[in-house]
Amino acid sequence: MPSQAVTYTTAAVAAVATGFLAYAVYFDYKRRNDPEFRRQLRRSARRQARQEKEYAELSQQAQRQRIRQMVDEAKEEGFPTTSDEKEAYFLEQVQAGEILGQDPTKAIDASLAFYKALKVYPTPGDLISIYDKTVAKPILDILAEMIAYDPSLKIGTNYTGGVDVAELMREMASAPGVGLD
């Protein structure tokens, strides 16, 4: 009796494989010889690509809206003012960002934690260069959107005196060249 079950199973598998092969041959024949079928395939591919593009744009807009909402909520909560509170808050937020950054589904939450740490850090420009070396790119991209949305965040280093190198570089870039080729 077991050999009969094996025979039925083999026959069923062979029938399914033959059916699949026959459909593949038929599809290839229609694709090569029927111009209307080819047009229909192209239309279908274009329609699908357009739907995917629209979905990507909508999801990107939704993500931007969520990022803005999270930044606004963080600003409403406020940030510490004393140096001891800032230091503790900074360490807490960086640690939270590192933990959340290990899970790719929590990239926005990790970025928010790094953003909060950036808000209390005395020289945000230096911290961004550290983030650039240690934080994953998707998180950095979201963090960049958060920074771009918040005009109160000054990225340049807090410089207390002497020559402001960033301002000097901007002035030099706007001045005509001397021709030092």
Curated annotation (Swiss-Prot):
It comes from Neurospora crassa (strain ATCC 24698 / 74-OR23-1A / CBS 708.71 / DSM 1257 / FGSC 987). The lineage of its organism: Eukaryota, Fungi, Dikarya, Ascomycota, Pezizomycotina. GO terms for cellular component: mitochondrial outer membrane translocase complex. This is Mitochondrial import receptor subunit tom20. GO terms for molecular function: mitochondrion targeting sequence binding. The keyword Kinase does not apply. It is a single-pass membrane protein. It holds the Pfam family MAS20. Central component of the receptor complex responsible for the recognition and translocation of cytosolically synthesized mitochondrial preproteins. Together with tom22 functions as the transit peptide receptor at the surface of the mitochondrion outer membrane and facilitates the movement of preproteins into the translocation pore. The gene is tom20. PANTHER family: MITOCHONDRIAL IMPORT RECEPTOR SUBUNIT TOM20 (PTHR12430), TRANSLOCASE OF OUTER MITOCHONDRIAL MEMBRANE 20 (PTHR12430:SF0). Forms part of the preprotein translocase complex of the outer mitochondrial membrane (TOM complex) which consists of at least 8 different proteins (tom5, tom6, tom7, tom20, tom22, tom37, tom40 and tom70). InterPro entries: MAS20, Tom20_dom_sf. NCBIfam families: 3a0801s04tom.
